[in-house]
Amino acid sequence: MERDKILCVDDEEMVVEALKIELVNSISSDIIIETATSAEEALLIVNETLKQGDRIILVISDQKMPGMTGEVLLAKLDKIIPQALKIMLTGYTNLEAIQYAINNASLFRYIQKPWEQED
């Protein structure tokens, strides 16, 4: 049976946990929430999810992370899971990163940290 998943990616553990708590309180209990603290871990989770026959319906990623940045991760994921919505979070306004994500990752939304629950 195909299960829907949401993937939250941020190098700060507290941020992914806060996202997970907000999502659990806002979405169907049928949707599984996965978390990753690096882009590399996120790619592994996506590959494992697809191998299991499940699907990622939404990716929420921080922009500024060590190693691979959020906009590069989202662009890679757009090639693997183009149907997934992609949201980028950042505490820093980097218009070049946002433009890159819009043009290369089909960015659905950009949210400034700290976010409001309505975001």
Positions of PLM-derived features:
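Two-component/phosphorelay signaling modules centered on CheY-like receiver
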Residues: 8, 13-35
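Alpha4 helix (beta4-alpha4-beta5 surface) of REC/receiver domains from two-component response regulators
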Residues: 72, 93-110, 117
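Helix N-cap/capping motif at the beta->alpha junctions
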Residues: 35-48, 70
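Active-site beta3 strand of CheY-like receiver
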Residues: 7, 50-60
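Active-site residues of response regulator receiver
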Residues: 10, 62, 90
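Conserved phosphotransfer cores of two-component systems
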Residues: 48-54, 77-83, 104-105
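Receiver (REC) domain active-site loop signature in two-component systems and cognate sites
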Residues: 65
